[in-house]
């Protein structure tokens, strides 16, 4: 049984008998999925493998970039250009949509003259601003390059529309990881791997955030060695929060009620909706890539127009 419901409300979002289909395997640690609607393909990262790959129905899995600077989270801007969090360079970069690395430009690499830790996950707002988390995972062996940390905190940042120096939004996370907007962008959700919880903030008109509070906690152990961690996170079109955690993808209501879990047979790193009607949930999980049919879609993002 792949769907374990704590509330019948979950079955409005995903069928009780939904199949978890493995569509690729043989990787090291998969992350950062992003669906390209113009080309009808999914890009995803393999950090320890230092590789970026592509999946589509015709060709299945192909390699598009190796090395990839151990890229992690990815998204697209309104023009369809790929935005990548790179662990090796401690940078947020933008490149051509195919992910091969052409047209690469650095959007953020330092804060107040100090190197960022290792940008992890990223989201683009409708005004063109880019928000990203900056934990230290990419300064650990395997997931990046082991090296000393220059900043003395782990923050969440905003790159203003049109570019510019990153603006610090919050600095009191232990390891900020997944982040996502509510459908109307009035709220920003950020999870903290070490604290095993999700916090939600109000978005202000100037791009800052306020009134941070815990939405849900107890999502995993916070222990990196256990692999039972809160990680990637997305909102669907109705405002439900889907987040990776122990044993699969956990689903919460906008008020924080736990609805249940879509069980995945490997440790899960992230998730993203895609496919012709945006109802397929793609789930990279350790050595494999999975997909699940849902009854909902991801929130409407700028690149979907």
Located regions from the model:
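Short loop/turn segments immediately following the C-termini of beta-strands
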Residues: 47, 87, 135-137, 193, ...
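Short loop/turn segments immediately following beta-strands, especially the blade-tip
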Residues: 97-99, 200-209, 294-301
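Short, conserved, GDST-rich strand-edge loop motifs in beta-rich repeat architectures
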Residues: 132-151, 294
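Blade/loop signatures of beta-propeller domains
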Residues: 1-21, 49, 209, 301-305
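A short loop-to-beta-strand structural motif that recurs across blades of beta-propeller domains
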Residues: 51-53, 91-93, 154-157, 197-199, ...
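Blade-level signature of beta-propeller repeat domains, shared across WD40, Kelch, NHL, RCC1
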Residues: 270-305
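A short beta-strand motif characteristic of beta-propeller blades
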Residues: 19-24, 59-65, 105-112, 165-171, ...
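Beta-rich, blade/repeat-based domains predominating
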Residues: 25-40, 67-86, 91, 112-130, ...
């Amino acid at each position: 049984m792949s769907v374990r419901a704590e509330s019948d409300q979950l079955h409005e979002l995903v069928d009780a008998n939904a199949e978890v289909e493995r569509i690729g395997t043989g990787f090291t640690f998969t992350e950062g999925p992003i669906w390209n609607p113009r080309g009808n393909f999914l890009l995803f990262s393999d950090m320890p493998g230092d590789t970026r790959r592509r999946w589509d129905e015709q060709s299945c899995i192909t390699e598009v970039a190796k090395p990839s600077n151990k890229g992690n989270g990815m998204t697209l801007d309104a023009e369809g250009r790929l935005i990548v969090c790179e662990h090796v360079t401690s940078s947020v970069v933008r490149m051509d949509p195919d992910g091969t690395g052409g047209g690469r430009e650095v959007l953020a690499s330092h804060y107040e003259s100090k190197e960022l830790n290792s940008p992890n996950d990223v989201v683009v707002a409708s005004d063109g601003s880019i928000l990203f988390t900056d934990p230290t995972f990419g300064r650990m062996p395997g997931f990046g390059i082991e090296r000393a940390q220059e900043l003395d905190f782990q923050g969440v940042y905003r790159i203003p529309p049109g570019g510019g120096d990153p603006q610090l939004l919050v600095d009191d996370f232990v390891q900020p990881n997944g982040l996502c907007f509510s459908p109307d962008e009035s709220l920003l959700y950020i999870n903290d791997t070490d604290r095993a919880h999700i916090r939600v903030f109000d978005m202000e008109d100037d791009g800052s955030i306020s009134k941070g509070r815990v939405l849900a906690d107890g999502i995993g152990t916070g222990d990196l060695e256990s692999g039972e961690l809160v990680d990637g996170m997305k909102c669907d079109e109705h405002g439900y929060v889907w987040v990776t955690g122990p044993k699969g993808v956990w689903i919460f209501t906008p008020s924080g009620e736990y609805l249940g879990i879509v069980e995945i047979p490997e440790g899960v790193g992230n998730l993203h909706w895609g496919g012709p009607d945006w109802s397929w949930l793609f789930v990279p999980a350790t050595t494999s890539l999975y997909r699940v049919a849902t009854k909902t879609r991801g929130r409407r993002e700028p690149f979907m127009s």
